[in-house]
Amino acid sequence: MAVPKRRVSKTRAAKRRTHYKVSLPMPIKDKDGSYKMPHRANPTTKEY
């Protein structure tokens, strides 16, 4: 079992954690001009 040789500082741990981010959803413009999420059906036009 792997055991850390020395303690990881708060700063180093925080720097590593900065890469764990939530990506924002990117809505796309539909044919009728409304924005929707990709790969979702449009409720008004019933298009995918």
From Swiss-Prot:
Keyword tags: Ribonucleoprotein, Ribosomal protein
Region annotation (Disordered) ranges: 1-48
InterPro entries according to UniProt: Ribosomal_bL32, Ribosomal_zn-bd
Gene Ontology CC annotations of this record: large ribosomal subunit
GO molecular function: structural constituent of ribosome
Pfam families in the cross-refs: Ribosomal_L32p (PF01783)
Bias (Basic residues) ranges: 1-20
Keyword RNA-binding found: no
GO biological process terms, semicolon-separated: translation
NCBIfam families linked to this entry: rpmF_bact
Family: Belongs to the bacterial ribosomal protein bL32 family.
Name listed for the protein in its UniProt record: Large ribosomal subunit protein bL32
Protein species of origin: Campylobacter jejuni subsp. jejuni serotype O:2 (strain ATCC 700819 / NCTC 11168)
Chain's gene name: rpmF
